[in-house]
Amino acid sequence: MLTTLLIELLDRIRRPWVPLLGAALLSGCSSLDYYGQLARGQLALLHARQPVQALIDDPAQPQVLRQRLALTQQARTFASDSLGLPDNGSYRVYADIQRPYVVWNLFATPEFSLQPQTHCFPIAGCVAYRGYYQLGRARGAAALLRQQGLETWVGGVEAYSTLGWFDDPLLNTMLRWNDDRLAALIFHELAHQQLYVPGDTAFNESFASFVEREGLSQWRASRGLATRGDEDARRRDALTRLVLDARERLQRLYASGFPPERMRQAKAEEFERLRRDYRVMRDRDWGGYNRFDAWMEGPMNNAKLLPFGLYDQWIPAFAALFREAGGNWQAFYRRAAELGEMPQQERTRALESLAANR
């Protein structure tokens, strides 16, 4: 969820020094100050947790909060009972962290490249961002990277998964979503607990996104709700295709060998083309629906384009795998895990073959 949704490995080990190790696994930053802010942020999150059922049963709590939390528990039970996702304490506790995002992720690229600045570690593999619990720290780190000639983008994250090592809480940042999106987010994060392949973000996010989508369809059916035409999902998919097309053009430009000034001018023209194509699509196909205007019309650079495509690249492949498994979740998870055990090049070929047979 993204989005939405990119830090995945804090608290991997049940020991007092886990925040420091988790920070190292994710961030790639050698600064003890950086480790310290992650440790403090994660410990504050753990300290803020409360049992969801106690809040639901407390008449002193706002009725709207109690109703939303009750819905999350129905979705949480469905996730384990019907989707075969891990049955543990995650999302049966709640934390109000008093801010709009749980972390802010910082992405960075060179001026003429779409290759992210990455940080690689034995368990987490390589990740293309660093996470900060305070927006000011993320912006400060971004400023330092820009002084080194890198382009940066900072994006807020509503939730992340600790992959089952601790009981991940529901967060106030998650409750602003509508009922379907809230249930889908729970399915997505639990899917990361079900299967995670170090160093392969596209695989992990596509797997979780497929479980989210198929799980939401089954969740709605279980509640007697009609299958919906997900206009929001179609718009997101269309926007993603638009951005990926722009990325392909930029990659060709950066490989051209043009002098820097010419490349800089052509790059600016590509970003303006992206905005122009977006406006046409918005007005022609979406009836003026402007949810993405602020993102599109804001400052644009390579780093801002990095997250696109990560969440859906292999969804067609996982959909084909689910059909091959006869719609049986446990069989699907076993086959997905087998893919995850392959060397990355072999795994990519297998996913490409599955996607071709969708």
Task: Pin down the residues of each PLM region.
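Solvent-exposed, acidic/flexible segments
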Residues: 45, 58, 65-72, 131-138, ...
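Post-signal peptide N-terminal segment of mature Sec-exported envelope proteins
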Residues: 35-64
